[in-house]
A protein has these predicted regions:
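N-terminal glycine-rich anion-binding loop in soluble enzyme alpha/beta folds
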Residues: 1-56
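Short, acidic/small-residue loops that bind anionic groups at enzyme active sites
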Residues: 87-110
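Conserved beta-strand elements of the Class I
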Residues: 7-9, 111-115
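Flexible, charged surface loops at secondary-structure boundaries
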Residues: 1-3, 66-70, 107-109
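N-terminal active-site wall of soluble small-molecule enzyme domains
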Residues: 57, 61-62, 77-87, 91
Length: 115
């Protein structure tokens, strides 16, 4: 049975993606499609004054491209993109989870440590 792929939106970064990293295809036992958002690095997304319109435009365009390529859901390579969850989910043709940090809200009355 053919599995539909997960799409991964990646910031334009250049560092080794070891097995276990979201940006390494060998980390998955199912199909994954990666899209690097050319020209959108971590500083663009989370600087003191990020260029939100440019980042959102890149997220939207690449989300649409991944959906067109068959992705049935999207994740990202950087938890910083959690800042864009609501905006991206509103325009993405498929479900989006930008960061595992989204699960913090499901831990009411618990102490959470984020490093």
């Amino acid at each position: 049975m053919k599995q539909n792929p997960l799409g991964i939106l990646m910031l334009d970064t250049r560092f080794p993606r070891i097995v276990g990293d979201v940006g390494n295809a060998a980390s998955y036992d199912f199909p994954v499609i990666f899209r690097r958002m050319e020209g959108i690095g971590s500083a663009d997304a989370v600087a003191a004054h990020p260029d939100r319109p440019r980042v959102l435009a890149a997220l939207k365009a690449n989300a649409e491209a991944l959906a067109t390529e068959g992705a049935v859901g999207l994740g990202t390579s950087c938890g910083f993109l959690a800042l864009y969850q609501a905006d991206l989910a509103a325009v993405s043709p498929v479900p989006v989870a930008t960061s595992a940090l989204l699960h913090i809200a499901k831990l009411p009355q618990r102490r959470v440590g984020v490093i």
